[in-house]
Amino acid sequence: MTHTTVLLNEAVDALFCNPDATADASATGAQVYVDATFGRGGHSRLILSRMTPTDRLIAFDKDAEALVEAGNIHDSRFSIRHQGFSHLDELPPASVAGVLLDLGISSPQIDNPARGFSFRFEGPLDMRMDTTRGISVAQWLANAETEKIAEVIRDYGEERFAGPIAKAIVARRQERGPISSTTELAQLVADTVKTREPGQNPATRTFQAFRIFINAELEELQQALAASLLVLAPGGRLVVISFHSLEDRIVKQFIAQHSRDVYDRRAPFAPPKVMQLKALARLRPSAAEVSANPRARSAIMRVAQRTAS
């Protein structure tokens, strides 16, 4: 399945609406933009179409398949790094006019059975964004303790049946060996969770939890947001599209935390830690976009601007 980029024009519009950006390269009229989640290149291609001849676009992605897709972009202004977006801090300080983070998993990733992201297809229980590093979900489940499995399902999937699901996974492992396929896990969850949320497969939350955990998605997001403060030039834009409440909560709290002056109660006469971001917008996809692309329904885009401090 081809990937339809969510909030495509809105995100790029927000990224470029920053006339006050003062990146180090601005003396020559050039700006540096970052697509921190290249995916299948939807945002990058539109960003390139909006850039001047001297601007540069740096993309990041952990997925080797994304790098193959990036090879189809023949533009000297574009480069991509086979890294997660937590590596943003490797860019020079105050050098970037705009950072875009699209936290959604791409349709080709979901719909490729070999990647193991979906309960709809028979495939190996992998779920790694970068298949060249780390262990798969199946490998982790083969040795994980019941309490840890339950913690992951509860904390990252917000699943109220986390305990019974974890116990069922371990019981299955002890009786017949570890789970190795997506459909095995989906069926086990369906057999364990006796209530159904309307319109949702009972395995949805468990699959989300394991994917987030095995890729350290929330930890990497926190690192990337912190790095954005370092690399964004004054006036530079931070645009983040999230797809579930855990991600959006982190983004919302980060922007709020850095959008106000902070006083040290232990030193009431000391100067405050001055705000570093200005919250600008919160946007949801239009009804028309959701109708055309149902995977957009949970998306939330937040925009903030780096202040001069």
Curated annotation (Swiss-Prot):
Specifically methylates the N4 position of cytidine in position 1402 (C1402) of 16S rRNA. Belongs to the methyltransferase superfamily. RsmH family. It comes from Albidiferax ferrireducens (strain ATCC BAA-621 / DSM 15236 / T118) (Rhodoferax ferrireducens). Its EC number is 2.1.1.199. The keyword Methyltransferase applies. The keyword Ligase does not apply. It comes from the Bacteria. S-adenosyl-L-methionine binds at residues 41-43, 61, 85, 102, 109. GO terms for molecular function: rRNA (cytosine-N4-)-methyltransferase activity. InterPro entries: RsmH (IPR002903), SAM-dep_MeTrfase_MraW_recog (IPR023397), SAM-dependent_MTases_sf (IPR029063). It is found in: Cytoplasm. One of its GO terms (cellular component) is cytoplasm. GO terms for biological process: rRNA base methylation. It holds the Pfam family Methyltransf_5. It catalyses: cytidine(1402) in 16S rRNA + S-adenosyl-L-methionine = N(4)-methylcytidine(1402) in 16S rRNA + S-adenosyl-L-homocysteine + H(+). This is Ribosomal RNA small subunit methyltransferase H. Its main location: cytoplasm. Keywords: Cytoplasm, Methyltransferase, rRNA processing, S-adenosyl-L-methionine, Transferase. NCBIfam families: 16S rRNA (cytosine(1402)-N(4))-methyltransferase RsmH.
